[in-house]
Amino acid sequence: MDPVDPNLESWNHPGSQPRTACNKCHCKKCCYHCQVCFITKGLGISYGRKKRRQRRKPPQGDQAHQVPIPEQPSSQSRGDPTGPKK
C-alpha cells in the first residue's frame, strides 16, 4: 500500500473520494459508486426529511363505497353474564 501523507486531512487522502460525482441513477454500477451511494441507493437508507404523501382524493359522485353500516343489536348489560344473583 502507498504511504499516506500525514499532513493531509482524511477526506483528502487518495481514494477517499470517487473520481466522478454521485448521481440519481439507481443502476447496479451507480449503487456501488461509493459508500454513500451504496447506503442510500443500494440499501435504501436515508436520514433526511420524509416527504409527506398526499392523500388520494376519492372520485367525485361515486357512492358505491358509501354503504351505510347496519346497526348492531345492543348487547346485554355489562354485569354478570349468568344473570343477577339472589
Swiss-Prot record:
Zn(2+) 1 binds at C22, H33, C34, C37. Residues 22-37 are annotated as: Cysteine-rich. Zn(2+) 2 binds at C25, C27, C30. GO terms for molecular function: actinin binding; cyclin binding; metal ion binding; protein domain specific binding; protein serine/threonine phosphatase inhibitor activity; RNA-binding transcription regulator activity; trans-activation response element binding. Asymmetrical arginine methylation by host PRMT6 seems to diminish the transactivation capacity of Tat and affects the interaction with host CCNT1. It is found in: Host nucleus, Host nucleolus; Host cytoplasm; Secreted. Residues 1-48 are annotated as: Transactivation. The keyword Transmembrane does not apply. Residues 1-24 are annotated as: Interaction with human CREBBP. Residues 38-48 are annotated as: Core. Interacts with host CCNT1. Associates with the P-TEFb complex composed at least of Tat, P-TEFb (CDK9 and CCNT1), TAR RNA, RNA Pol II. Recruits the HATs CREBBP, TAF1/TFIID, EP300, PCAF and GCN5L2. Interacts with host KAT5/Tip60; this interaction targets the latter to degradation. Interacts with the host deacetylase SIRT1. Interacts with host capping enzyme RNGTT; this interaction stimulates RNGTT. Binds to host KDR, and to the host integrins ITGAV/ITGB3 and ITGA5/ITGB1. Interacts with host KPNB1/importin beta-1 without previous binding to KPNA1/importin alpha-1. Interacts with EIF2AK2. Transcriptional activator that increases RNA Pol II processivity, thereby increasing the level of full-length viral transcripts. Recognizes a hairpin structure at the 5'-LTR of the nascent viral mRNAs referred to as the transactivation responsive RNA element (TAR) and recruits the cyclin T1-CDK9 complex (P-TEFb complex) that will in turn hyperphosphorylate the RNA polymerase II to allow efficient elongation. The CDK9 component of P-TEFb and other Tat-activated kinases hyperphosphorylate the C-terminus of RNA Pol II that becomes stabilized and much more processive. Extracellular circulating Tat can be endocytosed by surrounding uninfected cells via the binding to several surface receptors such as CD26, CXCR4, heparan sulfate proteoglycans (HSPG) or LDLR. Neurons are rarely infected, but they internalize Tat via their LDLR. Through its interaction with nuclear HATs, Tat is potentially able to control the acetylation-dependent cellular gene expression. Modulates the expression of many cellular genes involved in cell survival, proliferation or in coding for cytokines or cytokine receptors. Tat plays a role in T-cell and neurons apoptosis. The cell attachment site mediates the interaction with ITGAV/ITGB3 and ITGA5/ITGB1 integrins, leading to vascular cell migration and invasion. This interaction also provides endothelial cells with the adhesion signal they require to grow in response to mitogens. The Cys-rich region may bind 2 zinc ions. This region is involved in binding to KAT5. This is Protein Tat. It comes from Human immunodeficiency virus type 1 group M subtype D (isolate NDK) (HIV-1).
